[in-house]
């Protein structure tokens, strides 16, 4: 069985990966994996309009990469990136989205606007470094995801969930799709949605052994269903 990681294990594993790979490499593979999982569950023919919600950390970077790949797969992504990270990596990812003519919005959509304008929300707001409660700046966005009927695909962690314990009283939305990256986190044991995929096919054998990950065989696929 695949190992589910604690928050501290996930952080330590990421630091080990950063010593072996450039963060941009890992982000590119993670974001591509997310796009592939979305395509598996929500085809562009039925869910073309995707709101990609990006947070200020690595999870947001994964979202920007995912938006770019979704546009190449025939989707119509729109990016909402309320707190951009002022580092060259993230600025480059944002510019790449501009070059792909991916539109962005500056204001958090209301529940009614989200349901009128989008067929899917990609939640790339908070990653496994998150600790409750949700920062005040992001409360309206999390509230919208709480209340919307638009299906949600969460990248690695459903935003606002405790990384180990799962849903919190102030944030208990259930995404339709959870895309765990590298290895699933303990909160994924509480996931009750329809689709759970694992992506991030980049963990060297030595790290798989160190953390006893017992990862599934991807074969030629970018993601595997859990």
From Swiss-Prot:
Residues 10-215 form the YjeF N-terminal domain. It is an enzyme of class 5 (isomerase). Keywords: Isomerase, Metal-binding, NAD, NADP, Nucleotide-binding, Potassium. InterPro entries: YjeF_N_dom, YjeF_N_dom_sf, YJEFN_prot_NAXE-like. K(+) binds at residues 59, 123, 159. Coiled coil: none annotated. (6S)-NADPHX binds at residues 58-62, 127-133, 156. Binds 1 potassium ion per subunit. Gene3D superfamilies: YjeF N-terminal domain (3.40.50.10260). It catalyses: (6R)-NADHX = (6S)-NADHX; (6R)-NADPHX = (6S)-NADPHX. Its cofactor is K(+). One of its GO terms (cellular component) is mitochondrion. Its EC number is 5.1.99.6. NCBIfam families: yjeF_nterm (TIGR00197). Catalyzes the epimerization of the S- and R-forms of NAD(P)HX, a damaged form of NAD(P)H that is a result of enzymatic or heat-dependent hydration. This is a prerequisite for the S-specific NAD(P)H-hydrate dehydratase to allow the repair of both epimers of NAD(P)HX. Belongs to the NnrE/AIBP family. This is NAD(P)H-hydrate epimerase.
